[in-house]
């Protein structure tokens, strides 16, 4: 009998958002039969201690992630996770495979967005997709996935130095906001009937809000909620990556 897939999640410090994300991952793992182990370390954990833990988990677990954010001094340890164990898809080797169109671990949020588009009846083939935000976690890998053969979207990747952002967004059949700035995208920036994917999760005095303003609902044909939209899909794809090991 094959053993159940195993996933180790390493948390550094006590960030409330991290704790919430890990709880969601643990709940989903339990439902699908993945054995999840949570390793909780203090914020002042020395680099060597984290390196030793990662080295040990690389040998004993199927999947391994370090929950972000972590202190900048510890960020180089992310590259210590073996690419084959890197179910988050953050390792530079896995990102390199994505650039070349070689099979490998795909970052969970971009993979979840692609799955969400297909399952909601929004095949991106031939569509103009505008991605706002070029992080290596979401924006850049998503733009690569969308432009791959078989997906075949036409992609515009916007960032903090993009001129006339309003005009670029207005041309999108599908608009993805992944900036981390509350209510940055307004209805004046959206083409009537566009599909909106809101990746942002921002804590404000009014609670959690996305990168997309509520008034966009007046013009968009479909829009993902925050919370409860892209986030759950990210968790699902993490479990999928773990099961592929």
Q: What are the language-model segments listed below?
A:
Residues 68-111:
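Glycine/small-residue-rich loop that forms an oxyanion/phosphate-binding "nest" at active or ligand-binding sites
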Residues 4-6, 127-128:
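Residues that mark the start of a beta-strand
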Residues 29-43, 155-157:
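Short beta-strand elements in bilobed, periplasmic/extracellular small-molecule ligand-binding domains
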Residues 49-60:
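Short, well-structured alpha-helical segments in soluble
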Residues 77-95, 192, 197-245:
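Rossmann-fold NAD(P)-binding glycine/threonine-rich loop
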């Amino acid at each position: 009998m094959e053993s159940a897939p195993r996933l180790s999640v390493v948390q550094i410090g006590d960030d409330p958002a991290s704790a919430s994300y890990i709880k969601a991952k643990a709940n989903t793992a339990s439902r699908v039969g993945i054995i999840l182990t949570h390793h909780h370390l203090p914020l002042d954990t020395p680099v060597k201690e984290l390196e030793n833990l990662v080295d040990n988990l690389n040998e004993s677990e199927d999947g391994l992630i370090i929950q972000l954010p972590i202190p900048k001094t510890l960020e180089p340890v992310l590259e210590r996770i073996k690419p084959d164990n890197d179910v988050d898809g953050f390792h530079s080797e896995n990102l390199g495979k994505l650039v070349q169109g070689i099979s490998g671990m795909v970052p969970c949020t971009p993979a979840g967005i692609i799955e969400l588009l297909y399952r909601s009846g929004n095949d991106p083939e031939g569509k103009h997709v505008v991605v706002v935000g070029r992080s290596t976690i979401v924006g850049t890998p998503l733009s690569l996935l969308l432009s791959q053969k078989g997906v075949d979207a036409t992609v515009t990747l916007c960032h903090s130095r993009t001129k006339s952002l309003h005009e670029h967004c207005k041309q999108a059949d599908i608009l993805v906001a992944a900036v981390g700035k509350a209510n940055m995208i307004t209805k004046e920036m959206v083409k009537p009937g566009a599909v909106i994917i809101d990746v942002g999760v921002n804590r404000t005095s009014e609670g959690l809000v996305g990168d997309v303003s509520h008034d966009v609902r007046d013009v968009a044909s479909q829009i993902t909620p925050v919370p409860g939209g892209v986030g759950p899909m990210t968790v699902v794809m993490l479990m999928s990556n773990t099961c592929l090991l």
